[in-house]
């Protein structure tokens, strides 16, 4: 199950079920007749924090929301659990998750006693979050311990807003050049070329023959469907069954804000949408080329 809330910057917040488990974080048996002090060092938060941004990459699926390789951020994590006949709840904010805080302190263990530190770990899309919470337990060595039990574990994650085919307006940005696909007039046709403006909008459609790219900024009404000419220039024509208007997308549905994709033409099957420094425009469909493009959701 998941719940969704739209946020700014092309992202949406989705609540998903995640895996959480109690583990032995530290165990010490003091079989002597005097107390013993032990120094414990632990890291609270993300175990392997190796990014300057909050963007993570999923290494396994999370329901129907995250697939392997998908980018996401962790907004918060919440776990309810039972221990010693009581139910409790603990949560971590985004700041706490990403802080990766190292904590060191000393505990005193009485004689003939066993010290156990239970740590609550959560896994969100392959990212391990350590010491969400801890429980220190001191028992006689011979006593069988009661392991805390997770009741429910949920996380709020931030992912790119879903691109709904046929309705969601997007910008199409060249991944390497960081310029947007725009529409200008060439040879009395609407034509695609790269530019700095992010005001040009497109809608992706899909039919049985492939993906279609519709511009919302044509200067000739009805001439709005991207196709490859025989010479490789990309223009916008009236709607038809022409396979030159169909494209094969490199990424499976659903598409999301921030997805990086390629567009291969369905007629010129070895040719892909790409940058090329032409005489008047620079968006082409050329043989053995498949440049990467970033899809950005246009805020309503």
Swiss-Prot record:
Keywords, ordered alphabetically: Antibiotic, Antimicrobial, Cytolysis, Disulfide bond, Hemolysis, Ion transport, Membrane, Secreted, Target cell membrane, Target membrane, Toxin, Transmembrane, Transport
Recorded GO MF terms: toxin activity
Alphabetical list of SUPFAM superfamilies matching this protein: Aerolisin/ETX pore-forming domain
Superkingdom of this protein's organism: Eukaryota
Transmembrane regions: none
Major location category of this protein: secreted
Tissue expression pattern: Expressed by coelomocytes.
Family: Belongs to the lysenin family.
Name of the protein in its database record: Lysenin-related protein 3
